[in-house]
Amino acid sequence: MLKVAVMFGGKSVEHEVSIITGLQVIENMNKEKYEPIPVYVGRDGRWYTGKGLLDISNYKDIPSLLKKCEQVVLPPVPGLNKLYYYPFRKKFMSKEYDYIDVDVIFPAFHGTHGEDGTMQGLFQLANIPYVGSGVVGSATGMDKVIMKDIFKANNLPIVNYLWFLRKEYEKNKEAMLDLIESKLKYPMFVKPANLGSSIGISKAKNRDELFDAIEIAIYYDRKIIVEEAVKDPMEVNCSVMGIDRDLEISLCEMPVPWEEFLSYQDKYMRKEKGGKGSTTRQIPAPIPEEKTKEIQELAKKVFQILDCSGLARIDFLLEKETMKVYVNEINTIPGSFAFYLWKPLGISFEKLIDRLIEYAVERHKEYARNMYTFETTLLLKAADRGTKM
């Protein structure tokens, strides 16, 4: 039986959504094949484990919950595959420090310090198999500026955009507004570069609204991206699963919007019959078959270009009048792991989790084939000559 550390929470404005996703993963995991270990990461970055983390009702009072849990840490030491209790303590009648064995890590983070490559780097250093994209795919999938630059370099259809730094804007706000207006047409969307769930995003139809939108966005990030809005858009999403070039494509969905664009409240706070508070969606998306195929092929290409792994959801915009498709963004750890896009294909949430863990183990074996040493006499020569080369 594999011991799977399911990690959630984190230093992110999407903290609460991550808790829900993490508990959904644990709830739907096959307990005959896996032993789930809940690992909650607090807003301060500290890691906790304990049975109390399994009950969603306990999160109404997190300080009280954490008093019943124990802190753990993951040393970045290859081969340990252990979470150590912290402060470090020795096992009873032993000189060895107490720990929890871990075979696979299943990150269920959303947003910064979890979905952006930071945690993935730690898992990589510790040499533990982990679910989802690696450092590169996670980092590029989180930063909207780098993501859009890569899309543009690969001739993918995207809207016009520009980006700037918070300190550049604060140095001369009017000049930055002038620059944006000279490059882009209203209406526009202003977004923090490194957030998801529509947090910090605003639509601007004129200069005053543009100013207000930027003032909101700079509260969340040092880097801001501004995009031209698609006229009368329809949002369509598609999920991709697999590793390398062995990929599967899900059905497409069309979220039914409550407002002009899906806000955080729309996505997570409005209750849907039979759900845990989510967006109303149409599956499959009611669009022509050729557009469905076009979106599925683009989704696959995005997944490969960013070197993603495991599972991701790619979001698109369709201009209603022309039916032109635009790639919007990728979510390398989508909410609920987009299980609802795979269920109509006969892949239950439980089977989806199985696949993702299998991919994690397979990719880890592939990484193990890489050579990280190279025999050379360089240091011997340096010792003879001193530090000068």
Swiss-Prot record:
It catalyses: 2 D-alanine + ATP = D-alanyl-D-alanine + ADP + phosphate + H(+). Gene3D superfamilies: 3.40.50.20, ATP-grasp fold, A domain, ATP-grasp fold, B domain. InterPro entries: ATP-grasp, ATP_grasp_subdomain_1, D-Ala_lig_Van_CS, D_ala_D_ala, Dala_Dala_lig_C, Dala_Dala_lig_N, PreATP-grasp_dom_sf. It is found in: Cytoplasm. Binds 2 magnesium or manganese ions per subunit. Keywords: ATP-binding, Cell shape, Cell wall biogenesis/degradation, Cytoplasm, Ligase, Magnesium, Manganese, Metal-binding, Nucleotide-binding, Peptidoglycan synthesis. GO terms for molecular function: ATP binding; D-alanine-D-alanine ligase activity; metal ion binding. It comes from the Bacteria. Mg(2+) 2 binds at residues 329, 331. The keyword Manganese applies. It is an enzyme of class 6 (ligase). Residues 148-358 form the ATP-grasp domain. GO terms for biological process: cell wall organization; peptidoglycan biosynthetic process; regulation of cell shape. The keyword Protein biosynthesis does not apply. Pathway: Cell wall biogenesis; peptidoglycan biosynthesis. Its EC number is 6.3.2.4. Its cofactor is Mg(2+); Mn(2+). ATP binds at residues 181-236. GO terms for cellular component: cytosol. Mg(2+) 1 binds at residues 315, 329. HAMAP family: Dala_Dala_lig (MF_00047). Cell wall formation. NCBIfam families: D_ala_D_alaTIGR, PRK01966.1-4. Belongs to the D-alanine--D-alanine ligase family. This is D-alanine--D-alanine ligase. It comes from Caldanaerobacter subterraneus subsp. tengcongensis (strain DSM 15242 / JCM 11007 / NBRC 100824 / MB4) (Thermoanaerobacter tengcongensis). The gene is ddl.
